[in-house]
Amino acid sequence: MTGHEIRQRFLDFFAERGHRVVRSSSLVPANDPTLLFTNAGMNQFKDVFLGQEKRDYVRAASSQKCVRAGGKHNDLENVGYTRRHHTFFEMLGNFSFGDYFKADAIAYAWDLITKDYGLPKEKLYVTVFREDDEAEELWQKVTGIPKSRIFRLDEKDNFWQMGETGPCGPCSEIHYDLGIEAAEPGREHEQFPDDAGGRFVEIWNLVFMQYDRDQSGKLNPLPRPSIDTGMGLERIAAILQGKITNYDTDLIYPIIEHAAEIFGVTPGADTRTDTVLRIVADHARATEFLIHDGVVPSNEGRGYVLRKIMRRALRNVRMIGIEDPFLYKLTGFVGELMKGPYPELLESIQRVARVTKDEEHRYATTFLVAERVFNDAIKSIQGNTIPGALSFKLYDTYGLALDEQEDMAREHGLAIDRESFDTEMEQQRERARASWKGAEKAAVTPAYQKLVEQGRTKFLGYSELEAASRVVGLIVDKESVQQVPAGAKAELVLDQTPFYAESGGQVGDHGILYSAAGEKVADVETAFPGVPGLTVHRIAALAPIAVGDTLRAEVAVPLRDATRRNHTATHLLHASLRTVLGKHVKQAGSIVDPGRLRFDFTHYAGLDHAELEEVERLMNQEILRNTAVQTDILPLEQAIATGAMALFGEKYGDQVRVVSVPGFSRELCGGTHVQRTGDIGVAKIVYEGSISAGVRRIEAITGEAALRQYQETSGAVKRVADMVKVSEPALIEHIEKMIANERALEKQVEQLKNKLAQAAVGSLDAEARTIKGVKVVAAHLDGMDRAQMRALADSLRNKWKSAVVVLASVEDGNVAIISAVTKDLTAKVHAGKLASSLAQAVGGKGGGRPDMAEAGGKDPSCLDEALTAVYADVESKL
């Protein structure tokens, strides 16, 4: 059976038994911001198991794409060196949500592998949790497997739990005996269950989710036990196709063959090349699927893990002498190979190839330096261990990742002292923590903590822009005070406030505080969260203020309006970018203030003019629709389920605020927004550029600022058109002609200068003096630039064979000097020193090689005298 047939037979088997076949979810978890990558089939059903989500089916089956290359489940360093470790793999699974339980799960698994897949029963072994008598009995009763092939293992191997508390339960694993010929060298004598992954291969894990572990650790029976199973497609394919290693299956080996063809090598020729081919094949699969699902190489989070995977492949290929880009060719091949079960891959093949090739070029420029430093460093090592301090320096200073170092060390028969490396790493973390804590203490005063303990600030600003409030705290120089005089700079805390405290990229509000009598008592310069739940107002007092005073807090409406226009426009920008560029676009940072919006996002290349125009058009189209902006307070799970975008790594409470432009944008957001998109007026992109690898930045303006920009641009276009006496529609064509004419004239000037330079050869030949058999010329040639003088000096050297040439020109009061010496004379006359000496005479400096040098100066008054002196200087040296 082919790999695709094995996958399809699995899904069909369970569909025939009442299971809903559910498509694989993305490798980027949609409902779990705490999870780096989807790493198991049950991830997309997590909330169903937890009882937080209801679906219209109680049985499911899937073939889930998974990545394990970071965090708890990290197989990266083993990939390529073992038979069955992968970064990317597919997990076949069947699930029961309170429907069938152990007996049916065991029966289904046994029927599929022995009847549909045809595995011989006598080669199958089973493990159960040491206390799970029920499972052991069911295995014998349902399948007939003898007790001698059922083994009880401890909690580490055969008990599964989702977390410290919550659903958990015992599990059973099915293993297959590949035969003694599959045993790893030296392990032929091992018997099940001692042989871990050599002769005996785990193929299917059945989790019996029957308990709920509480805070005390007690296991309480679940009212509706569930089933979660997982079988690696690559593993079962290897068994059914008679292969010892997963890499020889038709799911992966075609990639190995294609890579070998690109590299000009033969699979099986030598161990090292085979290891590299396995690494490349696996990492090409991971790269293709991760980039397709929206991950972009970067220096943090998921992007960092992807970069590690890609660079591990690139570095290993360099070790067999291949330096040209190749990975982008393999990702396209993977897309074609996997298009049957994943037809959506065809839509992104070009994008994935482009991202991959860009990363390959970026790597080529950075790795060479790090590799050279590593190779130089290990020359001084005594013994077989690289000291942790040296390894940490390579990591910290030169960016050579530890896993890359370990692979490189392995090639030299060396190992890294991980313990001392970890010590160095922890010391750096402690330094960082100490620095952070010091900064934190400087910013967060004890006064804030005391105030928030007395009561949190009530925020009224979503619906109110002014409010009567009571002063509950005043802080000056980090100390609480009871009152402040007029003219004081202070921090003020109110019991309730309409002022938005800076967060989520949106700046804090400005405004005014009034006394009960209507007197203006303070300017509010900004508001910020001193600690969570406490809004601190930074003020300039205009009159005395005391704790307990009742004030009227009034937000500066024009500034708030401008800010919320920009904030809603940021959401429109984000949605438009995802429409134009693809769903891989994710927010990487933002700033929203009254004057502009700045939005950082993940993308692999700069936007061209057409893309920027389309993004801007979509934003303004939605503004013209004047859609009502909706805000809802929802449970986090419900908000995510409705498609609201959440930022990876952000911590959200149980209840979240969802801001929606129906049919266009939906995000989790705590900021302030317009009531209708039409309130934005107009949006204009004013900047697009790169801020780091894989991260772009756009700046835009809205409302009156955008209108002014359009007016200024229109006015400038009209003035230019008037200056050149053409209509505005004809302006671009006219300017293009002007530029073409200018370039033609510049070319003519260059040609004339070259002719003058060639003509100068003859005059300088006549002007040159012969000193001790050497041609020497020192000439003042105005009208020539440095490049022309350099070319002229070369011509004279080539013509004269043995010569010293010094040329100078003056332009705009600045002196340019070129000195050239033929190779036979450099031991006596140094061109760099000659130029330096001449430069000093004209108030400048310079120097260069013994045979060619440049210099300059700012005092041309002494130039001719200095040139005359060159002859005597050269004569003294010959």
Swiss-Prot record:
Gene3D superfamilies: 2.40.30.130, 3.10.310.40, 3.30.54.20, 6.10.250.550, Bira Bifunctional Protein, Domain 2, Threonyl-trna Synthetase, Chain A, domain 2. Signal peptide: none annotated. The keyword Transferase does not apply. It catalyses: tRNA(Ala) + L-alanine + ATP = L-alanyl-tRNA(Ala) + AMP + diphosphate. Its EC number is 6.1.1.7. Binds 1 zinc ion per subunit. GO terms for biological process: alanyl-tRNA aminoacylation. GO terms for cellular component: cytosol. Keywords: Aminoacyl-tRNA synthetase, ATP-binding, Cytoplasm, Ligase, Metal-binding, Nucleotide-binding, Protein biosynthesis, RNA-binding, tRNA-binding, Zinc. One of its GO terms (molecular function) is alanine-tRNA ligase activity. It comes from the Bacteria. Its cofactor is Zn(2+). Zn(2+) binds at residues 567, 571, 669, 673. It holds the Pfam family tRNA_SAD. SUPFAM superfamilies: Class II aaRS and biotin synthetases, Putative anticodon-binding domain of alanyl-tRNA synthetase (AlaRS), ThrRS/AlaRS common domain, Translation proteins. It is found in: Cytoplasm. Consists of three domains; the N-terminal catalytic domain, the editing domain and the C-terminal C-Ala domain. The editing domain removes incorrectly charged amino acids, while the C-Ala domain, along with tRNA(Ala), serves as a bridge to cooperatively bring together the editing and aminoacylation centers thus stimulating deacylation of misacylated tRNAs. This is Alanine--tRNA ligase.
